[in-house]
Structures are given as C-alpha cells and as structure tokens.
C-alpha cells in the first residue's frame, strides 16, 4: 500500500522540530539536493510603480532680473516680512516653501516664474 500525501503530511506534523531537521538532512543526502528556496523564474516583472509624491518643496533657483517682483511674491506665499523675504531671494538658491501639496507647489512655481524667477519643485 502506497503512502498518500496526506499520510506523509500527518506523519511530519507529529514530528518534533529536531526530527524534521534530521529528515530534511536525510532527504538532501539521499537525493543530492539542498533545501534552499528556489527562485521561481516567472514572467518578466513590470517596472515597479513609483509612488506619487504627495509633498513638495518649492526651491528658488535664481531670482532673475526682477528681484522686487520676486520678493513681493515670496512675501505673499510665505507671509514673511520684507526683510526676511529679501533674504530668501538674495540667498537663492533656497527653499521658499516645503511640505506642501502638488497644486499649491505648482501655483507657487507659476507665480514666482511670472515674477521672473527660476524655480524648481522637489
């Protein structure tokens, strides 16, 4: 009478961990294999889908020729005083706003570019 898969599974489930380890070693020796997990070769994996960025940073790369206009826009966007906004513009490249939504970042970029600045979103 041949053993079924169910008989073998029941026998193994009643074994201790040490007995299972010994069984695996014996099977490796008998069949000349190792119990290392085989890597399945499936169909080519599609490129991983990049998570869409949810928080953006508006970086003033260059103030351009119209610094006064850029300072005004920086003040509107950040709520900074004149002196602080001028320091941001004079210190370009630098962060204007960070941790904001995509829509807010694009609106800030558009406003700064219309004022004459060069802007990057990160």
From Swiss-Prot:
PANTHER family on file: 39S RIBOSOMAL PROTEIN L12 (PTHR45987), LARGE RIBOSOMAL SUBUNIT PROTEIN BL12M (PTHR45987:SF4)
GO molecular function, a single term: mRNA binding
Protein name per the record: Large ribosomal subunit protein bL12
Keywords: Ribonucleoprotein, Ribosomal protein
Assembly behavior: Homodimer. Part of the ribosomal stalk of the 50S ribosomal subunit. Forms a multimeric L10(L12)X complex, where L10 forms an elongated spine to which 2 to 4 L12 dimers bind in a sequential fashion. Binds GTP-bound translation factors.
Domain of life: Bacteria
GO biological process, alphabetically ordered: translation
Function description: Forms part of the ribosomal stalk which helps the ribosome interact with GTP-bound translation factors. Is thus essential for accurate translation.
GO CC list: cytosolic large ribosomal subunit
Family statement: Belongs to the bacterial ribosomal protein bL12 family.
Pfam families for the chain: Ribosomal_L12, Ribosomal_L12_N
Organism from which the protein derives: Azotobacter vinelandii (strain DJ / ATCC BAA-1303)
InterPro entries the UniProt entry points to: Ribosomal_bL12, Ribosomal_bL12_C, Ribosomal_bL12_C/ClpS-like, Ribosomal_bL12_oligo, Ribosomal_bL12_oligo_N_sf
